[in-house]
Amino acid sequence: MKVLILNAGSSSQKSCLYEIPDDALLSEAPQPLWEGKVNWTQDRSVAEIEVKTARGETLHESIYGDSRQAHVTYMLYTLSRGATKVIGQLSEIDVVGHRVVHGGQNYRHSVIITEEVKQAIAKLSNLAPAHNPAALEGIEAIEKSLGDVPQVAVFDTGFHATLPDAAAIYPGPFEWVEQGIRRYGFHGISHQYCSARAAQILGRDLASLRIITCHLGNGCSLAAIKNGRSIDTTMGFTPLDGLMMGSRSGAIDPGIIVHLMRQSDYSAERLDYVLNKASGLRGISGVSSDLPQVIEAITQGNYRAQLAWDMYVHRLRSGIGSMLASLGGLDVLVFTAGVGEKSAGIRQAACEAFGFLGLKLDPEKNQNKPVDIDIATADSTVRVLVIHTQEDWAIAQQCWHLLKR
């Protein structure tokens, strides 16, 4: 089975092609036959197309003009044309899987995409304005290029549909619940994959483990996982809640918003920009939303950069502590995504606060660019894993299961 994956972002569209045996799923993620990416510069009419294959062929082109959908269509054509050709024709693709950030209350599981599903994704765009419209662009590009090939939507919110009401419902008026205002949680595809991968690496039954997964990238979230299910998470109604992030504030006193909106120069649009684009590491440090650049500024004696680091660590530790309380204990702590996988300093700073649990980090393993391994000492009572998140492979697995039903 040939499975094409599209992973839409606000300024990029990533894609890859897997070949999966029809009779059984592989236990670990295979190397994709082909990987493509469209990056849009601030001038949305310019697209940087990057393609590589498992054989080592590469393509890098800049395309001017046309629509974003046309840019995605062009990227897809490189699957069956030119130096990066890996299939004879696009019709060889059996199914296309899409990461869709927000599925709302109605989409708890992966589904075959229909007109009704597309309309629901569009309707939920106000809750994920940077991602749901981009996912629709990818869906429509596939319809144009591949016709009636089955398409599957895999929702980032789906894994958190198991949250108990006490964790999911906000303590506002009950009318909010009736309006669908609740904690949805995000990064669910990553949290689910990493929890299953952790159990696989440790040779343990997933259902027997109490796991906290730390997805730390430009966006950051934690999940508390028990019996293989999400029972608590830090992101909420939108991906703005929870931890301090690259450019997002995370959780703040809502009274601050009321206070600012009473000032005539703070519109809803300005608040949306400030909280999503000008806060977090960027807002506090004044340097960047990128942690390595903040760390570089710290080495130069930048006070605000040091403050940003200290706040980031404080809120990460507090978040892990709250997830710990929801679980009633901890067997496995997982770090994943750009910061989680690459920053030994963040892992060390986070783990130092939980020595009282008997958690002991192996300094050498932590510093040695770990991938899919346990970096705790042999006598640590909590296993600490660094896992390379494989969202695309997780989506491909769900496509395989859905078509095999």
From Swiss-Prot:
Active-site residue list: 156
One cellular-component annotation, GO: cytoplasm
Keywords recorded for this protein, A-Z: ATP-binding, Cytoplasm, Kinase, Magnesium, Metal-binding, Nucleotide-binding, Transferase
Listed EC numbers: 2.7.2.1
Principal cellular location given in the protein's record: cytoplasm
Binding site for ATP: 14, 215-219
Cofactor comment: Mg(2+). Can also accept Mn(2+).
Cofactor(s) this protein cannot do without: Mg(2+); Mn(2+)
Any one GO BP annotation for this protein: acetate metabolic process
InterPro entries on file: Ac/propionate_kinase, Aliphatic_acid_kin_short-chain, Aliphatic_acid_kinase_CS, ATPase_NBD
Site, as annotated: Transition state stabilizer: 187, 248
Reactions listed under catalytic activity: acetate + ATP = acetyl phosphate + ADP
Binding site for substrate: 99
Localization of this protein: Cytoplasm
Pathway linked to the protein: Metabolic intermediate biosynthesis; acetyl-CoA biosynthesis; acetyl-CoA from acetate: step 1/2
PROSITE patterns per the UniProt record, alphabetical: ACETATE_KINASE_1, ACETATE_KINASE_2
Physiological role: Catalyzes the formation of acetyl phosphate from acetate and ATP. Can also catalyze the reverse reaction.
Designated name of the protein: Acetate kinase
Organism the protein comes from: Nostoc sp. (strain PCC 7120 / SAG 25.82 / UTEX 2576)
Classification lineage: Bacteria, Bacillati, Cyanobacteriota, Cyanophyceae, Nostocales
